[in-house]
């Protein structure tokens, strides 16, 4: 069996690779990246690293040859990624891959206001019509975002705001997303044409999550229930581009295109993320981490920022 992982040098790709190396021989892994040098350690362990670019269809098909199942980690290129994902799916089929596992998003409905949600919806449609076997992992909002990326500034300023209203989300640990993906890949034949909701174990409003973090930090943090226009004005004042710019999103920042972030919050407010499942436990045999546990895991970094 040969498992292909796209975007293998990204944070999620690395986490999934590390877990797979505990389950299958390294020689069964084909890791795709635009920057092979970043995966030198995996090469040393015996994994095969291949250069691949979703904007280069012929090269991508060559890179996929010999694979049995591919993990298609959604790209960050808003506006381009439906075409990139379509290219990858067609290249996979041409290369002889039989099964594609795709990292999608919760709340995938044609009516979603979320820009990324619409792109995931379109990609899912292409994949389901491709003739390939598939597994779709619809990830909820990362539970790590607030405690890892937003809390240091919230503690310093004493306030934070979202335009999600009373909308609810079941935040999921990125580590759990990696666990679910690795388990599906290692046993992909048992997940044929399945769609899973990859969520945390409990629904919260954003205000609930901030209140919990405030209690844990022992710092007063005022939650602001903002309008979408107010939130857009904040992003504009921060100089965040409304449109996606290549390279603006990475593993240490949450500064994505503001139009995407605003429409994502709209989707939460309108109830598209009000989904809570036990699919992680069903897939992996272990329950998903609670939001409180994820906060605990990141708590020490707040002290370093104070």
Please annotate each region the language model reported:
Residues 1-28, 33-37, 55-58, 65, ...:
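Oxidoreductase cofactor-interface core, primarily capturing Rossmann-like NAD(P)-dependent enzymes
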Residues 6, 73, 103, 285:
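Residues lining the SAM
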Residues 38-45, 62:
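Short loop/helix-cap segments at secondary-structure boundaries that form the rim of catalytic
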Residues 43-56:
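Rossmann-fold cofactor-recognition segment
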Residues 64, 68-71, 101:
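N-terminal Rossmann-like NAD(P) cofactor-binding module of classical short-chain dehydrogenase/reductase
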Residues 83, 172, 204, 275, ...:
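Conserved active-site and cofactor/substrate-binding residues in soluble primary-metabolism enzymes
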Residues 232-306:
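A hydrophobic C-terminal alpha-helical subdomain
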């Amino acid at each position: 069996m040969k498992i292909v992982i796209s975007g293998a040098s990204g944070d999620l790709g690395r986490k999934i690779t590390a877990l797979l190396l505990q389950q299958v021989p390294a020689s069964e892994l084909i890791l795709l990246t635009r920057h092979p040098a970043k995966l030198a350690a995996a090469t040393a362990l015996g994994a095969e690293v291949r250069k691949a670019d979703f904007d280069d269809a012929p090269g991508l098909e060559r890179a996929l040859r010999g694979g049995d199942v591919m993990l298609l980690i959604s790209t960050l290129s808003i506006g381009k990624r439906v075409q990139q994902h379509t290219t990858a799916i067609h290249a996979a089929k041409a290369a002889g891959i039989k099964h594609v596992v795709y990292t999608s998003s919760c709340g995938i409905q044609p009516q979603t206001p979320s820009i990324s949600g619409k792109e995931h919806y379109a990609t899912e449609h292409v994949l389901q019509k491709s003739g390939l076997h598939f597994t779709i992992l619809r990830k909820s909002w990362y539970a790590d975002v607030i405690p890892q990326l937003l809390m240091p500034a919230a503690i310093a300023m004493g306030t934070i705001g979202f335009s999600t209203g009373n909308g609810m989300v079941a935040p999921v640990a990125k580590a759990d997303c990696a666990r679910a993906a690795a388990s599906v890949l290692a046993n992909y034949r048992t997940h044929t044409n399945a769609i899973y909701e990859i969520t945390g174990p409990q629904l919260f409003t954003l205000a609930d999550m901030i209140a919990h973090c405030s209690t844990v930090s022992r710092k007063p943090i005022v939650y602001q229930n903002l309008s979408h226009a107010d939130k857009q004005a904040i992003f504009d004042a921060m100089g965040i581009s409304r449109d996606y710019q290549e390279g603006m999103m990475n593993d240490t920042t949450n500064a994505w295109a503001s139009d995407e972030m605003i429409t994502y919050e709209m989707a939460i407010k309108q109830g598209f993320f009000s989904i809570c499942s036990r699919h992680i436990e069903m897939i992996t045999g272990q329950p998903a981490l609670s939001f409180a546990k994820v906060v605990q895991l990141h708590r020490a970094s707040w002290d370093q920022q104070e």
